[in-house]
Amino acid sequence: MSDLVIVESPAKAKTIKKYLGSGYEVVASMGHVRDLPKSRLSVDIKKNFAPKYEIIKGKEKLVDDLKSAAEKSEHIYLATDPDREGEAISWHLAYILGLPTDETNRVEFNEITKSGVTNGMSNPRSINIDLVNAQQARRILDRLVGYKLSPFISQKIRRGLSAGRVQSVAVRIIVDREEEIRKFKPEEYWSIDAKFIPKGSRKSFSASLYSDENGKIKITNGEQADKIEADLQNAEYVIAKVKNGTRKKSPAPPFITSTLQQEASRKLGFQSRRTMKVAQELYEGVDIEGMGATGLITYMRTDSLRISNVAIEEVTEYIKNSYGEKFLPPKPRFFKSRSNAQDGHEAIRPSMPSLTPDSVKASLTSDQYKLYKLIWNRFTASQMADCIQKTTQADIVANGYTFKASGYRVDFEGFTTLYVESKDVEEEKTTQLPPLEKDMIVRCKELKKNQHFTQPPARYTEASLIKALEEYGIGRPSTYAATITTITSHEYVKREGKSLVPTELGEVTTNLMKERFPKIVNVKFTNQMEEDLDKVEKGTEEWHALLDNFYGDFDKTLKKAKADMEGVKLHLKEDETDIICDKCGRQMVVKVGRYGKFIACPGYPECKNIIKYVEKTGVKCPKCGGDVIIKRTKTKRIFYGCSNYPKCDFVSWNEPTNEKCPQCGGILFKKKGKKPTLFCATEGCGYTKTADTDDK
């Protein structure tokens, strides 16, 4: 009899099977097999919050197949993902297969390589019940909030709405930022910049006014700037101080889940959901030419910065051979994880550092290659030497005013030869200064006054929202992608370029939640709940008690809100159309229902006339001349079709434009991305160009 190994996905099963050989059957559970059914609450509150799990609809045959395979096996190993969710899947599998939870049949693979699989199979353990209970508590908590609160929100605002323990706080953070922006009052200020040329030199350098005789200067109006400009007319400028120094810049640590999502958003333009999908593929295994199915990275749901000694030895050897010993730090770098990190895992790193991105590029999709290269570069750079910069700072004085100039040159590239961390906001660019000496006289080539106004705080991007959620301790990095997908798909938040902007629906819902359920959308309260859930995971808090403590207050608050708001309905603004109701003559309006927008008569319920809502793009169909309209799939992905469908079958994922191709006369389509492009879809043409700023 062979041994049975159960994992979540077919891709993972294929990779593991390659390493285990013929003595094992490796099958996939396709994720969870049991869950709380969607049709009802499925939590018995009176019986200590007992969950009522059921086999997930459509998985009955899969469960039968797993039972059949288990009966024919000598040993059964549960090899689901090494995290809270994976532990719960193993626990549910043990239940349906009749396996004792204290049996040592749980194995973990931090990386799906020969050594990773061998190590995992050599160290089986029993199911971690504390981890399972933490997952159950989180699941039941989310179910109580969602299933109790969503109907109330839907009744008061609009059908089909949802509320959630994490998603509602995420929306609040975005709404609060929008309120900050609206309330912001810009303040005027001025700067004065100069360009100087040292005596006997042709190279100029820039400096900014920093202080006067009374200290650091603040210029608040044009009159003050004019006076300073007048004071400096025909003044002699002298170098008062020159300070030369050395600055070391150390590499960033390897990725954890949250930083991978942030950096992939900034550098690659990937949404978090896309990042996690591709990372899962790289972890579970990709067919590499000459190697077969190979797991390329370690487990991607982690908040630990720990790196194994073996990985450090391998990457050190690679750096030494490829760059030379001078690119190695004096000793290997070890990074400290956050205090609440699950340190059982490693950071996200290549499972085999010797597999460079270019060596596997031919076997990867474009997205897989980009993300693997990002992970590989970041990890390798984290074990490289510091970048060393030679810095110069100079003070230039004239008539009691001091200008400051700074610059640097790279003396040794170190890790920056491979990887430079990006930021949401570009760092100030600094250039190298010419040779300067104290008491040197310099000529002022240009003196420029600049008017500025203080700027409101920036709207959140996906990257900065993830950073904020992590800093506030809301949710867990593994859930951020799903949270952002939820709040955008439910139209509480919309995307404008990279910015996340609250919709009217998001603001109305958040204001209702703040008024009636302040704890649910309170950042500190949500963070405390996360800390309590972590205590359950560590076995220091009982999960039933956690739920009981939460639910008592929540239930009272909900009952009071229902009583206080009985008969109250909050109304969203309705956009008027130019369509006149053909039944009663009123001007029809755009409404939003459970399944999206529609056009209705405002005379409801006396007049129940409704018509389909069509979003026109202003572009004519290239096939029949009809209107190109925006359509959405079941998952709300946008595509473009013809208003004359089904008579005309024009359809495109890319947005058509009114611009004609200069080569063949066909219409150009817009392809979105980090750098949007316009391209001609006419077969054999191939014309493409970068989209104008207005097109982006």
Give the predicted meaning of each segment.
Residues 1, 81-82, 158-162, 244-253, ...:
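Conserved short loop/turn motifs at secondary-structure junctions
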Residues 15, 19, 65, 88-96, ...:
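Alpha-helical scaffold elements adjacent to nucleotide-binding pockets in ATP/GTP-utilizing enzyme cores
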Residues 138-149, 166, 196-198, 247-259, ...:
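Core structural elements
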Residues 216-253:
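Metal- or metallocofactor-binding catalytic centers and their adjacent structured scaffolds
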Residues 1-139, 148, 210, 222, ...:
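Intrinsically disordered, low-complexity regulatory segments
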Residues 239-242, 251-264, 291-300, 456-468:
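Short acidic, hydrophobic short linear motifs in intrinsically disordered regions
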